[in-house]
Amino acid sequence: MTHDPLLNARRTGYTRDGFAARYHAHRPKPPSALLELLLQLAGTRRPQLVVDLGSGTGISTAVWAPHAERVVGIEPLDEMRAMAEAGDAPPNVSFRAGVAQRTGIPDGAADIVTCAQSLHHTEPAGTLAEIGRILRDGGVFAAYDYDWPPIVHWDANRAFDAFMDGVRALRMKHGIRREQEQWEKDEHIERMHRSGIFRHVTELSLHNVERCTAERLVGFACTISLVLPVLDLGLSDAELGLTALRETAERTLGAEGLPWYVTYRVRAAVK
């Protein structure tokens, strides 16, 4: 069957009412060190164009505003893109409807292309070919994903793991299967090597520190695609395991929250 990138994007479950706002409120931002690294690899302090594929609500797009002449986010889902456009992004940041395999960006126009927590949702051969087309010679592509949950407190993280175990059990009990086609993140680097598009491919880890409250940890849990179908079962928070997660997070993180250590796995390549 022919791969339909827009249909595949919709199967994430990210089109649910209220999801985009929850995602935007609780997901972490990329670390400043990542931007510095990509600027260094691209050999420029101020790129003419940065393209963010699968830009979602714009978290990973707007961070480039102070660093680039122009930033374009490509996002297939209207609901996520509407949240991005409703924000206070500067005038040099814009968002377009599109998929990673068909961006509408001119040949060789981009200095930097990023996929933040999104490459595993896209068919890789067509996506990498499009990235190769829109990148200039010497331009840089980076796919980066964070480990979840980020580390905040051992007991809160243990409660998060228990919640996810419960989610998997509920999926099995109710016969919920993943509809969306996905590609393993651990295989990104090998696919980038095999594409023949890039002169140099490397992999590293970076981290960021943000603030995590109980509300944020629970909200983050409710933005994970594996969790979303379980939330539709009509179960109580106690039956879902959210009550136990919330109570542990409130007890361990306190009213002000604690530092949240977010590890990013970065796969970067130079064309």
List the model feature ranges, each with a label:
Residues A125, W183-K271:
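Conserved Class I S-adenosyl-L-methionine
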Residues G132, R136-E210:
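Conserved catalytic/acceptor-binding region of the Class I
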Residues Q117-S118:
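Short catalytic micro-motifs in class I SAM-dependent methyltransferases
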Residues T103-I112:
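A short acidic, Gly/Pro-enriched loop at the edge of an enzyme's catalytic core
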Residues T57-R102:
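Class I SAM-dependent methyltransferase SAM/SAH-binding core
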Residues T122-I131:
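A short, conserved alpha-helix within the catalytic core of class I
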Residues M1-G54:
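Conserved class I S-adenosyl-L-methionine
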